[in-house]
Amino acid sequence: MYYTEESLETLKHSIDIVSVLGEYVHLKRSGADYKACCPFHDEKTPSFIVYPTRGHYHCYGCGEHGDAINFLMKQQGYSFSEAVLFLAKKFHVDLVIKTKTKESSGQDSKECLRRINKEAERFFQYCLLCLPEGGEALSYLYKRGFSLDTIDRFQIGYAPEQRVFVRAMEERGISVKQLEWAGYLSKDWFLFAQRIMFPIQDSLGYTIGFSSRRFKEGGKGGKYINSPETLLFKKSRVLYGLQFSRKRIAKEKRVILVEGQADCLQMIDFGFNCTLAAQGTSFTETHVKELVKLGVSKAYLLFDGDAAGEKASLRVGDLCQVAGIAVIVCRLPSGQDPDSFLMQRGPEELRELLDRGEDYLSFLVWHKIRSYEQFTPREKARVVEEVIQQVQHWGSPIMIHEYLRQLASLVKVPEAAVLSYLSSIKSATEDKGKKADAKEVCPDPEATAVAYKGGKASKKISPRMILEADVIRCLLFAKPEEEFVPATVRHYLSPEEFHCIEYRSIFVMAMNHYNEKHMLPSMDDMMALVWGTEAMTLLVDRRINTELMRDIVVQAIQKLLDKHWRDRKRNFCHQMGKELDSLQEYVRLSEERIKVSLVS
């Protein structure tokens, strides 16, 4: 802990818990206390009670309880330190740092940096609003749609020439050396001279850096110059606009992501106060992890209407999907960004645009299809394969299955074909080298069984099971008008030839349906009997050439009957001391052997 017990105790007695919780829940007075519907679970009758005199809350519905610090940690996702700093700032309590240690020394440096940033922020805003040289920057902001209220709300400012800035900071007790340490000066050059200044704040509202924008033609440096990284400012972790959007994001579990600071501020100013932007870099996995910490379950991507914006949507969307965040892509008209769209069409049309957004998978498929001049079957197969390569990393197996079903519908291919390709990817990754062994049929199933990994569990798959899968696969992929396959299977095989319970179930269903309606049941109906099992994975692991379907089914039946005959003979010989004492059994085995010869 960085702060003394005395200062924390002072903070505790300064906190008005009703003032804190009242920003997040609708409190109603009930005698000396307050009540509300609990923010931690769904309810219609209020059972969430706040006790002002004790500085405590308790929900008699779900049992949640604690003080203001506990509430911020649970409801807003703050760490303990963040909650303490937030409350200290809100109630104007100066926290006293403990006696110097390595940790407290670093904390002391952070406090010093916060003070420098705050003084700079106040000075920049003063320059924009009060000095003649800030008039040109103010005019530029007005033309971009920034009102005085907006400028004041977001503490937007203007940085003058270096000598003016340095002199003003020295008057406030901040030396040139400290300005260099804080990232304002670099080799005696003021990074932000004659630029519009957008403060970068953390989730608690403390200014941790600046993003500056050039507004004059011919100005020094690039269009944007951001503060260098410091003890407080880490570009890869900062989500711009979080201090204004955190409350609504925590409540609604959704976020709107945009590219630039101006876009973000205008969105928030127009009431879309669940908007965030990356800072200084493009969105990264670290940013997405921060969204997950905030409890975000859905992200709307509202990037610029150009090729770069489309590319960003593809990349950020995949990062979010992998993290378990559902993505909605909202495409702006060509050449527009959220800022210009709001200025030209207003917030209502933007809400409609957000409502019309498409899920990320549909956007991804659309993007890939559009890259081909002609969408032939070969291109369709390529799109399916490329998309599956991404989808296989999106969340739980159940969600992946749902995405694959949607993919099959979007590109109009059988679900089983999509599942088959996914299984082939997994097989190639998990079991390289074993696939060829699994295709060989040897006399002794125990000696030649192969390890097959088709799911969470690993099971020994015998050659017999592989043969049974070959037969069932023919039934699955047989064309509706195909008579030879079901008729041949029905004539030569019976349920006892199938040792795998799942394959036997498919065989029985298929034959009953064929006998009754003279056609096979749908592939989906048959696959439902084995869904989620290793039998299914083995079934869809191999592709089948439908042009050679007749030859394949005949060979599969022949091998299965031959296997069945040899297994029965081996078992019989073992039981009878390798002598065929029973003429009746010998005759029956001979008849089965004849059947094999007839098929071949």
Swiss-Prot record:
Mg(2+) 2 binds at D304, D306. This is DNA primase. The keyword Nucleotidyltransferase applies. Binds 1 zinc ion per monomer. Its EC number is 2.7.7.101. It catalyses: ssDNA + n NTP = ssDNA/pppN(pN)n-1 hybrid + (n-1) diphosphate. One of its GO terms (cellular component) is cytoplasm. Keywords: DNA replication, DNA-binding, DNA-directed RNA polymerase, Magnesium, Metal-binding, Nucleotidyltransferase, Primosome, Transcription, Transferase, Zinc, Zinc-finger. The lineage of its organism: Bacteria, Pseudomonadati, Chlamydiota, Chlamydiia, Chlamydiales. Its cofactor is Zn(2+); Mg(2+). Contains an N-terminal zinc-binding domain, a central core domain that contains the primase activity, and a C-terminal DnaB-binding domain. A zinc finger (CHC2-type) spans 38-62. InterPro entries: DNA_primase_core_N_sf, DNA_primase_DnaG, DNA_primase_Znf_CHC2, DnaG_bac, DNAG_N, DnaG_primase, TOPRIM_DnaG_bac, TOPRIM_dom.
